[in-house]
Amino acid sequence: MKIACLHTAQSNVAIFDEAARALDLPQDALTHKVMPHLLEQAQAAGGVTPEIEKETIAALADLRTDADVVLLTCSTLGGAADFLAQDPGIMRVDRALAQATVTAGQPVVVLCAAPTTLHPTAALFRATLPQTTPLGVELIPDAWALFESGQHDAFHQRVAEAAQQAFARGAGCVALAQASMAGAERYFSHPKLLTCPRAALVQIAARIARERA
């Protein structure tokens, strides 16, 4: 199975490759396309504009022509994938993450780093989880500035600290809303700490297993 990933950060390439190796997916299963200007434009505009959405949809459709599955790995742009929702081969990784929280434990705390991710993430999780599930969607102060300045280790440490604090406050599970946050697992591990790359690739691995059965 060929899996094409559409990223807005180059650093996410290694994160997804690492997650694929951890799940024993074939070494050449993933291909990557990086379009950082999409997120840069969304941040400058204060959100996703129709033009950004249109370009994202076109990029997803183009990748789909040669891939069994296309993953949109940027949570800010996630809504663009919904325009192609009739195609089960196009996935937004944050939706896989939200689906994984349904049975992971309550209350659910979702941590975001980029301000532009906060609104689409909150909408997605509220739509996915049962109405009775306690849900908190939080922005980690100052984290995104670390990422944007290239201080990725400090960024992941800050995310890990926020996750640890959320569990200490009583979270049943903590979801890291952005793929770029997954590196926090190097600094803090917990069986109920969920990440986008793993959640999405677990779904795909399960699909592969069903097809082989």
Placement of each model-derived feature along the sequence:
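Non-catalytic structural scaffold of enzyme domains
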Residues: 1-213
